[in-house]
Structure formats: C-alpha cells, structure tokens
Amino acid sequence: MKVILKENIDTLGHIGDIVKVAPGYARNYLLPKGLAVEATEKNAKALEHVKRQMAYRKDKVTQAAKLLLAKLEGITVELVHQAGVEGKLFGSVTNMEIAAFLKEKGVDIDRKKIALAEPIKQVGEYSVPVKLHPEVTASLKVNVSAPAAAE
C-alpha cells in the first residue's frame, strides 16, 4: 500500500514522501495515528499545494532573517563593566545582557538566538554569532570595557 507521510518517520522517510508499506502497518498504525494518508490522486494534489505553501512561508522567514542580518551588521554592542587590574570582569557578560542592549537599539532578538558559548569574563572585543534562521547566521561585535577611572 502506498501512503504519503505527514510526519518524519526515521525508518520510512520525511514529510511529503510517498512510500510503499505493508497494508497492515498502514491500516493499523500509520493511518490511525495520523502519521500518513493514503496515496490517492486527491491527496497527492493536496500535498503539492501544502508543499508550495510551506516553501512560500520558508522563503518569507528567510527574507526577514536576511533583513535583520543587515541591521545587525552595523551595530557594535558596547558594554561597560567593573573589572579588576588584569581586565578580569567582576561578574560576566551573558546573552541576556547583549539582547537587552540590542532591544535598546531597536533590534528585538530572542536571547536564545545569541550563541554565546560561555559568558564573557574578560575585557576586550569579541565576535558573537547570532543564529537568526537555520540558513542565516550573523556575527555581532561585542566590545566589553572597564569604566574610566575617576581622578
């Protein structure tokens, strides 16, 4: 029996694949659980329509991520933190602080998209990747400095 998969199934294939399975497997497992539909002419046409819609949505999201990438290219995050003599920070800079700085600048990014491997604990300039979309990753400049000593 041929079925069209509605979910990714490791042993069979990906969403939208037309696969041949045993009739009992289809009737007793795939169809009742909503993991697949029978491969008819009508269902195949509906699948093509859904694929076109998904491609359109994916294209739209990718374009939005690229626009956000262009915004981020011109921004340098400037953070001032108390630091010791050797440039070691009292505390650390996290992705939450970077996201708050960006929000002040008018760029709203979820902190989870800022891929900071570990918190920044030294004064200096860093390049931090921001995963806007699976296909689009921006590189954000973060400059951490100590406040100027008052004399």
UniProtKB/Swiss-Prot annotation:
Query: Keywords on this record?
Result: Ribonucleoprotein, Ribosomal protein, RNA-binding, rRNA-binding
Q: Name one GO biological process term.
A: translation
Gene3D superfamilies in the record: Ribosomal protein L9, C-terminal domain, Ribosomal protein L9, N-terminal domain
| TM helices/strands, residue ranges | none
Show the InterPro entries listed in the entry: Ribosomal_bL9 (IPR000244), Ribosomal_bL9/RNase_H1_N (IPR009027), Ribosomal_bL9_bac/chp (IPR020594), Ribosomal_bL9_C (IPR020069), Ribosomal_bL9_C_sf (IPR036791), Ribosomal_bL9_N (IPR020070), Ribosomal_bL9_N_sf (IPR036935)
- Entries under SUPFAM superfamilies matching the protein: L9 N-domain-like, Ribosomal protein L9 C-domain
Q: Which GO terms describe its molecular function?
A: rRNA binding; structural constituent of ribosome
Write out the GO cellular component annotations.
ribonucleoprotein complex; ribosome
Keyword rRNA processing in record:
no
Task: Note the NCBIfam families from the entry.
Answer: L9
What is this protein's function per UniProt?
Binds to the 23S rRNA.
Q: Would you identify the family this protein belongs to, as annotated?
A: Belongs to the bacterial ribosomal protein bL9 family.
Task: Identify this protein by name.
Answer: Large ribosomal subunit protein bL9
UniProt source species: Pelobacter propionicus (strain DSM 2379 / NBRC 103807 / OttBd1)
Q: Report which gene this protein is encoded by.
A: rplI
